[in-house]
Regions:
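C-terminal low-complexity, Ser/Thr- and acidic/Pro-rich disordered "stalk" regions positioned immediately N-terminal
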Residues: 645-686
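Solvent-exposed loop segments of extracellular immunoglobulin-like
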Residues: 578-594
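Charged low-complexity "KEKE/polyampholyte" interaction tracts
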Residues: 384-390, 396-548
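Surface-exposed, proline-enriched loop/turn segments that connect beta strands in immunoglobulin-like
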Residues: 556-561
């Protein structure tokens, strides 16, 4: 969290307690969450935080390429080299993603090392993820014996340093600890350091003391900038806890060490403040309520006449949630406003500060999947600007080597014209140049937050629909990613992120245009309704089509070969679907039938563009057909070949009755409908043939005689 310089310096003076309690909300306003894999419906771990500073503060998402012997320099105290932290790493850094400040905000645009400022969240090519930092605090007793160090490492460089050098989460913990041992800490923070096997919460406790604890699979955690959330841990078990050498001996030697009843050092109560302020306390109560593990008024906390939580009783870093979270619930946790309890609901009480507030600059959640290789185990979900009215974008950030520049301008070239410390509706109504997604969601948030009564509900509902579509389709893309050979995964990661960015931008840009038109019209008598939102059915009128870019149609019923008589009907058909989790994508499939020519090549048949095709049967012979099925995204699947064989139709003589045929040897018409007589065929010279002939002659003579008699009678 970007903390104003005056506030950081106040942490080192005697006015700390009074200042923090009276400090304006932006000074301490980040919230960190952790959900162990046994407390989720997916079996995945979720961890991350939101970064709070001001309503219209520019952040950029991008990829830092490796650097030889990188220099880490801080302008946190002043834009003069040497006044802050500076360190040169000997070696080549790892590639990593970042969510970085515009260096112009720090007068660092002309200093290559210092320009990599406040990178906050990312994953490196080794699969190590960092979310940094959650600003915390220390108490006056600790300040007196181990004050913070101006030239120590602080939030300005923490994420860049860790992502540049860490080969694993534990390696990151150890390397950061060594830096603090040597250079000290510029501020008090908690930092998430995770990989595909473990997640650590690293705490900068004071000038030179630190501790890192490994998070369990059965717990959750919410921390809104509170240094004193307690966590009992065996300090001698290095599989669960790493720490500075003097983390116990220093406070013990000065008689400020706090212990549990059994004598175990209570590190966080020893170092943290007793009360971090009502804004922090209220957000902790909101977070616990969100996860179904609500704190009890009077028992666990007290409130003032405005409903703000003024103090916490025995607050803990971890707890057992009352619900199991899915991906959507994990993402939305950083937008919580106390909706689960009217007494904590910031939508009902403007005096309450909320986790989901109008000063968030970006939010990140890392979804970590056990059992997968480090290159694809972690999905970084990133929401630009305030996440209350935003959509998180997923990326395989360990693999990512590029981002679409239209949507994510480089951190050192982005136009900062549209930003500001205060929210500005007039600025949000101005159409911006380019397609910067940060500015699109910044303006959406400004308009929705400041017109909550008429716009907030339907905008949030519509964005939730889009978010759920992205989540469902990410599962589809993930199946493809896991099946993709390792050497081809980076290409898919880059294309997938570009595709989801484009799809979300198109939806968000259209939404913003409609919101601006609504506000400019000045008529709020009816609630704003996004044109793409089907409120009755709780869906969008046209879906996000992220996974569609990678899922070809699946042919479920192949065309079958047919044999028929000349002139008869020969019908071919195909059935197909698109397994992309997109409603209505099957209805957008198109078809084209082809016939094989004498040269062996297939050519398209004019007008044969349906799932069924009736082949021509005017000529005797065989022809081979196939069909191409194309998705709305242009991906094609080709069917098996099917052969239509046309045979010569049976020839009937004039006057011949149905069911009769002519005996080739005797020219005698026989009734084939009657049952054949048992025995051999008649042969020339057989008595049966003579008998038949005589009977025939006799019959003819009899008829002629009858005719003559009839004539005479006349």
């Amino acid at each position: 969290m970007r903390l104003p310089a005056f506030a950081k310096k106040a942490f080192r003076g005697g006015i700390v307690a009074a200042l923090v309690l009276a400090m304006p909300a932006p000074a301490l306003a980040c919230t960190q969450v952790y959900i162990g894999k046994n407390q989720t419906t997916t079996g995945d771990t979720y961890v991350g935080r939101d970064e709070d500073y001001s309503p219209r503060y520019c952040k950029t998402f991008g990829v830092q390429q490796p650097i030889d012997n990188p220099v880490f320099r801080s302008f946190e105290n002043d834009s003069v080299p040497g006044t802050g932290f500076e360190y040169t790493y000997q070696g080549r850094s790892y590639r990593y993603t970042y969510v970085r400040d515009n260096p112009g905000a720090w007068n660092a645009q002309d200093d290559e090392a210092a320009s990599r400022v406040y990178s906050e969240a990312g994953t490196n090519e080794r699969g190590v993820s960092v979310s940094a930092t959650l600003t915390t605090d220390y108490n006056d007793g600790i300040d007196a014996i181990d004050p913070l160090v101006d030239t120590g490492i602080g939030e300005y460089n923490l994420a860049d340093y860790l992502l540049s050098v860490s080969s694993s989460a534990r390696d990151g913990v150890e390397k950061l600890g060594a830096i603090i041992d040597q250079y000290g800490s510029q501020d008090c923070n908690q930092i998430v350091i995770a990989d595909n096997t473990e997640t650590w919460i690293f705490a900068q406790l004071s000038g030179h003391q630190w501790i890192a604890v490994k998070m369990g699979d059965d717990v959750a955690s919410v921390n809104p900038n509170i240094g004193g959330l307690q966590y009992k841990v065996n300090l001698d078990d290095e599989s669960q806890c790493l720490h500075s050498a003097d983390v116990v001996t220093l406070p013990k030697s000065k008689d400020v060490l706090v212990t549990y009843d059994d004598g175990t050092p209570n590190i966080f109560k020893t170092y943290g403040k007793e009360n971090s302020g009502s804004s922090q306390n209220t957000r902790l109560a909101q977070g616990r309520a969100y996860f179904g593990a609500a704190l009890a008024p009077q028992t666990d906390y007290t409130v003032d006449e405005q409903g703000r939580v003024t103090s916490l009783i025995d607050p803990q870093l971890t707890f057992t949630p009352g619900i199991k979270s899915d991906t959507f619930a994990a993402l939305r946790s950083l937008a919580a406003r106390g909706e689960q309890d009217d007494s904590l609901n910031a939508n009902l009480n403007s005096a309450l500060y909320a986790i989901g507030n109008n000063r968030t600059t970006e939010s990140n959640i890392f979804q970590i999947r056990s059992g997968l290789s480090s290159d694809i185990a972690t999905i970084q979900w990133e929401a630009l600007s305030r996440c209350e009215f935003s959509v998180y974008l997923p990326s395989y950030s360990a693999l990512l080597t590029e981002v679409p520049a239209d949507y994510f301008p480089a951190w050192n070239t982005v136009d900062g014209t549209y930003t500001g410390r205060k929210d500005d509706v007039a600025q949000a109504l101005v159409e911006k140049d380019g397609k910067n997604l940060d500015y699109v969601f910044m303006d959406i948030n400004t308009l929705a937050y400041n017109n909550r009564a008429s716009m907030g509900e339907n905008v949030r509902a519509y964005l939730d629909v889009l978010q759920k579509q992205v989540i469902a389709q990410q599962d589809v893309v993930d199946g493809l990613m896991q099946a993709t050979p390792a050497d081809q995964r980076t290409d898919l990661a880059n294309k997938a992120f570009a595709a989801v960015s484009e799809q979300v931008y198109n939806k968000a840009a259209k939404l913003l245009d409609e919101m601006r038109a609504y506000v400019n019209a000045g008529d709020t008598s009816s609630a704003f309704m996004p044109s793409d939102y089907d409120a009755e059915n709780g869906t969008s009128r046209t879906p996000i089509m992220y996974a569609s870019a990678f899922v070809a149609p699946s042919i479920t019923a192949q065309p079958q070969s047919v044999t028929c008589a000349q002139g008869a009907e020969a019908k071919l058909s195909v059935a197909a679907t698109v397994d992309d989790s997109v409603d209505g994508s099957d209805a957008q499939l198109t078809y084209q039938w082809f016939v094989k020519g004498e040269d062996g090549n297939f050519s398209a048949i004019d007008g044969a563009t349906a799932a069924e095709y009736v082949a021509a049967t005017t000529e005797v012979g065989s022809k081979v057909y196939r069909v191409e099925v194309t998705s709305a995204a242009g991906l094609v699947s080709t069917s098996d070949e099917a052969t239509v064989t046309v045979t010569q139709a049976a020839q009937e003589e004039p006057g011949q009755k149905p069911g009769q045929k002519t005996d080739v040897k005797t020219d005698v018409k026989t009734d084939t409908a009657k049952k054949a007589t048992k025995g051999g065929l008649a042969k020339t010279g057989d008595s049966s043939v003579v008998t038949v002939a005589l009977l025939t002659v006799a019959g003819v003579l009899a008829v002629m005689g009858a005719v003559l008699i009839r004539k005479r009678a006349n």
